[in-house]
Amino acid sequence: MAKVLVLYYSSYGHVETMAQQVAEGAKSVPGVEVTLKRVPETIPADQAKAIGIKTDQAAPVATVDELADYDAILFGTPTRFGNMAGQMRTFLDQTGGLWMKGALVGKIGSVFASTGTQHGGQETTITSFHTTLLHHGMVIVGVPYACSGLVNMNEITGGTPYGATTLAGADGSRQPSANELDIARYQGKHVAELAVKLAS
């Protein structure tokens, strides 16, 4: 049984929605156990409430040490100036002990993201995230062009060969589109299929 973790940070629910669909895609693969978790919020509760952070998310909070228990991890993050969110960075900066033990070497790592605007740094967020995963010796997996949603030219949409993405809009009012959610499910399924092969 291959074990897959979908681990995310979401400020306003967009990445949470994407993470749920990534998990659904992974669950569609036989022989896979899927866990959905989030990283801790680092903004003080009163400040988070004041700026509308979505704190009522059902996914439990992950611990750093449990990352070693999985065969594949799909990481989800909003972008912050072309990089991962600080909450995800803070979590990953605590993985030095895992790095020392080589605990993540050979495991699959994959990334999906959200930006406020069409050109808001989706691809750089994902590719800069890959640097951390490569330092851990993880095997990077994206979304191949076998996923038809990547070539959808009929609408403004997220989705890259580096990973699924969504556009939240500058005010956060835009929700993930059907095409973006399809790509998210594809990514989860694709990673899970590869995890089964590696685990066997």
UniProtKB/Swiss-Prot annotation:
Cofactor note as given: Binds 1 FMN per monomer.
Recorded GO MF terms: flavin adenine dinucleotide binding; FMN binding; NAD binding; NADH:ubiquinone reductase (non-electrogenic) activity; NADP binding; NADPH dehydrogenase (quinone) activity
Presence of keyword Transport: no
Reaction it catalyzes: a quinone + NADH + H(+) = a quinol + NAD(+); a quinone + NADPH + H(+) = a quinol + NADP(+)
SUPFAM superfamilies for the chain: Flavoproteins
Pfam family, one: FMN_red
Binding locations of FMN: 10-15, 79-81, 114-120, 135
PROSITE patterns linked to this entry: FLAVODOXIN_LIKE
Positions of the Flavodoxin-like domain: 4-191
Alphabetic keyword roster: Flavoprotein, FMN, NAD, NADP, Nucleotide-binding, Oxidoreductase
Known cofactor(s): FMN
Similarity field: Belongs to the WrbA family.
Matches recorded under NCBIfam families: flav_wrbA, PRK03767.1
Protein name, entry field: NAD(P)H dehydrogenase (quinone)
Annotated organism of origin: Burkholderia multivorans (strain ATCC 17616 / 249)
Organism taxonomic ancestry: Bacteria, Pseudomonadati, Pseudomonadota, Betaproteobacteria, Burkholderiales
